[in-house]
UniProtKB/Swiss-Prot annotation:
The gene is ahcY. One of its GO terms (molecular function) is adenosylhomocysteinase activity. Its EC number is 3.13.2.1. It comes from Coxiella burnetii (strain CbuK_Q154). It is an enzyme of class 3 (hydrolase). It is found in: Cytoplasm. Keywords: Cytoplasm, Hydrolase, NAD, One-carbon metabolism. This is Adenosylhomocysteinase.
Amino acid sequence: MENDMETATMTQDYHIANINLADWGRKEIEIAETEMPGLMALRKKYKNAKPLKGARIAGCIHMTIQTAVLIETLMLLGAEVRWSSCNIFSTQDHAAAALAQKGIPIFAWKGETEEEYWRCIASTLEGPKGWTPNLLLDDGGDLTAHTLQKHPELCQNIRGVSEETTTGVHRLYRMLKEGSLKFPAINVNDSVTKSKFDNLYGCRESLIDSIKRATDVMIAGKRVVVCGYGDVGKGCAQSLRAYGATVYITEIDPICALQAAMEGYRVVTMDEMADSADIFVTATGNTDIITHEHMLKMKDQAIVCNIGHFDNEIDIASLQDYQWMNIKPQVDQVIFPDGKRLMVLAQGRLVNLGCATGHPSFVMSNSFTNQVLAQIELWQYPEKYPIGVYVLPKHLDEEVARLHLERVGAKLTTLTEKQADYIGVDPEGPFKSEHYRY
């Protein structure tokens, strides 16, 4: 496979696993388009205006079928793109092949090494004939950090970055505080139609899908610990309970802990549950959540996985000297000196993309419609965005939701003038204040 990829690199402006998967990828892209009404509506609305004409976007998001629909939407709106994946295991090779076959510069394949991962990101920042980006589209912050640290000369021409996920947003705010952020950023993650849909409903479906594909384990009757009760943790806990698991939550935030308790979950500590739970899921965006000491206490055949962005929530490094037995791609048994076995999924990286195909197309349409609108905002209205971290305005958040209602058979009630005046809003919205918590 590696030889095939190197040959492709020398002859084409892409680096993927297998171009022969392109037809399969194209069929799945066409199916996904029917489930992504937000992106298709933007194509229809802007196909003639081309609001991204002149934009050169370097993108770093999981190279999935749904991302392919996003990329082709950006291009139909006038942009040029170069793309890599933000995770070494998350690429769907048939999706990458379908885009590469159309001449789109894609640098991603499932199972990259760390070195190859960073080489792919670097490839998105430099193209033929002096091509460099003037916009970034990121997931997790690696592309942004790499640009700032390794290519500071590019920053003066970059109008901004739109960031997809919680982890990347945390990094942006840290960069802003430290003074190292050199261009504006739009925090797509905190759009309501992203965090309350992708993070919650997406994880509610994709976590179970990945655990089932990886292990074939019966969820019902199992004791499962979900570490973190933010939107991602909430979605995971809901699906696990729906399948019949007894769910325990660990939390640092008293508000989230109280929410979990009021939903009927037991709020516990890892130290308390390490020796008795069957499945452990980390969903915190933090580091050292499951330590080596915790794993020493776990029982034989316990399953350990992560649905946070990076691989540092579980101390995988501490297991490297033990015997690893690969069961199938991204599923390993780690055998401890005493003979105990732990099932480690996706080497502690994003389990829903390492062991399955990620979130369904419909919920990703929400997220990616926000991404397109953020890119248009940064490109069309740079004067509105000095260096800082912003969220999309409320009226655009509501518009994203509106574009998806028909697909689920939902009909809106329309305010009368009297009703709108009574609560002090425009009949067309926005309907909630900026600080409203959905």
